Amino acid sequence: MNLNLYGHAGKWLMVDCGVTFEKRGAINIVQTADPSFIAERRDQLVGLVVTHAHQDHLGGIHLLWDQLECPIYASPFTRHVLQSKLRRERCGAPVVEIPPGENLTLSPFHLEWLPVTHSTIESSALLISTEAGKVLHTADWKIDPNPVVGEAFDKNLWHSKLSEPVKAIVCDSTNATRPGHSLSEDELYEGLDQAVASSKGRVVVGCFASNIARLDTLA
């Protein structure tokens, strides 16, 4: 799960509000982060920004909404996924659409959305600026030269945006501590194509429903 808070000049910015993945057993359990710190200061909370449309980044919003009640910002695709979930959960939280590549000021924070490659559409990192300096919040990312969905890693864009030093990089990437490089999603197509072509019957493939890149590969 993900829930990050950035504070400056008596104000707070929240980035993502997710849940853990279900643990199957006698009782199916999902968990959210403990919101008590920011719930006690919600009059200082200027907004919640959702980086991408995965449950570990947005799945806790309907559960914690009555303790937050702040503006929510997301890209068009992320907003669509989030609103669908909110409707199912009968939560009326409004979500403001921010087109990819746009900037937003939620004083005292200035936010720049930077595209990153991930397994869903419109995933972004956030460059958060205040008078005290800049912090780069990556969210989930992958340097993939041939992504199936989304934009390829643009080295020139990142060099230009990070030409000035940042105070910190808050980095989130699954299996980032494992050595080596992950395969490009594009490299999976040939193997999947051969497996399906050689099958004499129906082929059933299981994957996360939110893995848009894998669904595109299978299609």
Task: Show the residue positions of the predicted features.
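His/Asp/Glu-rich metal-coordinating catalytic cores
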Residues: 1-49, 54-219
